[in-house]
């Protein structure tokens, strides 16, 4: 899949509706930060929960007009290890999709093992970091793909 011109970065955002009092604020922060960075959010897709993200992320990664995907969610600790299972399996699958499609999928999912209060404290940090990481990775992947390593050595990409 080809990525767009470096000056025009197009993102998709997938946001969980579970714990929406938190994730709706994460979405607002992510959209504001994307605008601040000068990148375009082509589509926002809401899914029931973080565990449900992978199928939507995969569909977005298939599209040439999407350079990377930001995921936003909050997996709050409960009475069982359910939060750990959800967070671990979701992160693993999202990383697998990123590698499979050669496009960044960034993890703006708070948790596991956090309380509601801890998640609220992390809204801004996780949202902004997920967008920033996607933009940095897209730019660096583009540079890496343009370099002819048969002709250049000691290359540093930042």
From Swiss-Prot:
<feature type="binding site">
    <location>
        <begin position="74"/>
        <end position="76"/>
    </location>
    <ligand>
        <name>5-amino-6-(D-ribitylamino)uracil</name>
    </ligand>
</feature>
<keyword id="KW-0686">Riboflavin biosynthesis</keyword>
<comment type="pathway">
    <text>Cofactor biosynthesis; riboflavin biosynthesis; riboflavin from 2-hydroxy-3-oxobutyl phosphate and 5-amino-6-(D-ribitylamino)uracil: step 1/2.</text>
</comment>
<feature type="binding site">
    <location>
        <position position="107"/>
    </location>
    <ligand>
        <name>5-amino-6-(D-ribitylamino)uracil</name>
    </ligand>
</feature>
<comment type="similarity">
    <text>Belongs to the DMRL synthase family.</text>
</comment>
<feature type="binding site">
    <location>
        <begin position="79"/>
        <end position="80"/>
    </location>
    <ligand>
        <name>(2S)-2-hydroxy-3-oxobutyl phosphate</name>
    </ligand>
</feature>
<feature type="binding site">
    <location>
        <position position="122"/>
    </location>
    <ligand>
        <name>(2S)-2-hydroxy-3-oxobutyl phosphate</name>
    </ligand>
</feature>
<dbReference type="InterPro" id="IPR002180">
    <property type="entry name" value="LS/RS"/>
</dbReference>
<feature type="binding site">
    <location>
        <begin position="50"/>
        <end position="52"/>
    </location>
    <ligand>
        <name>5-amino-6-(D-ribitylamino)uracil</name>
    </ligand>
</feature>
<dbReference type="InterPro" id="IPR034964">
    <property type="entry name" value="LS"/>
</dbReference>
<dbReference type="InterPro" id="IPR036467">
    <property type="entry name" value="LS/RS_sf"/>
</dbReference>
<feature type="active site" description="Proton donor">
    <location>
        <position position="82"/>
    </location>
</feature>
<dbReference type="GO" id="GO:0009349">
    <property type="term" value="C:riboflavin synthase complex"/>
</dbReference>
<comment type="function">
    <text>Catalyzes the formation of 6,7-dimethyl-8-ribityllumazine by condensation of 5-amino-6-(D-ribitylamino)uracil with 3,4-dihydroxy-2-butanone 4-phosphate. This is the penultimate step in the biosynthesis of riboflavin.</text>
</comment>
<dbReference type="GO" id="GO:0000906">
    <property type="term" value="F:6,7-dimethyl-8-ribityllumazine synthase activity"/>
</dbReference>
<keyword id="KW-0808">Transferase</keyword>
<protein>
    <recommendedName>
        <fullName>6,7-dimethyl-8-ribityllumazine synthase</fullName>
        <ecNumber>2.5.1.78</ecNumber>
    </recommendedName>
</protein>
<feature type="binding site">
    <location>
        <position position="18"/>
    </location>
    <ligand>
        <name>5-amino-6-(D-ribitylamino)uracil</name>
    </ligand>
</feature>
<dbReference type="Pfam" id="PF00885">
    <property type="entry name" value="DMRL_synthase"/>
</dbReference>
<dbReference type="GO" id="GO:0009231">
    <property type="term" value="P:riboflavin biosynthetic process"/>
</dbReference>
């Amino acid at each position: 899949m080809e990525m767009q011109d470096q000056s025009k970065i197009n993102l998709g955002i997938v946001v969980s509706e579970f714990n929406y009092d938190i994730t709706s604020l994460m979405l607002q922060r992510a959209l504001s930060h994307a605008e601040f960075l000068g990148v375009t959010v082509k589509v926002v897709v809401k899914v029931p929960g973080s565990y449900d993200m992978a199928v939507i992320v995969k569909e977005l990664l298939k599209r040439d007009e999407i350079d990377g995907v930001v995921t936003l969610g909050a997996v709050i600790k409960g009475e069982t290890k359910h939060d750990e299972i959800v967070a671990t399996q979701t992160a693993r699958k999202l990383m697998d999709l990123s590698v499979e499609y050669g496009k960044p999928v960034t993890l703006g999912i708070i948790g596991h093992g956090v309380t509601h209060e801890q998640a609220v404290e992390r809204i801004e940090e996780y949202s902004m970091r997920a967008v920033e990481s996607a933009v940095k990775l897209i730019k660096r992947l583009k540079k890496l793909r343009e370099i002819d390593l048969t002709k250049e050595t000691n290359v540093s990409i930042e």
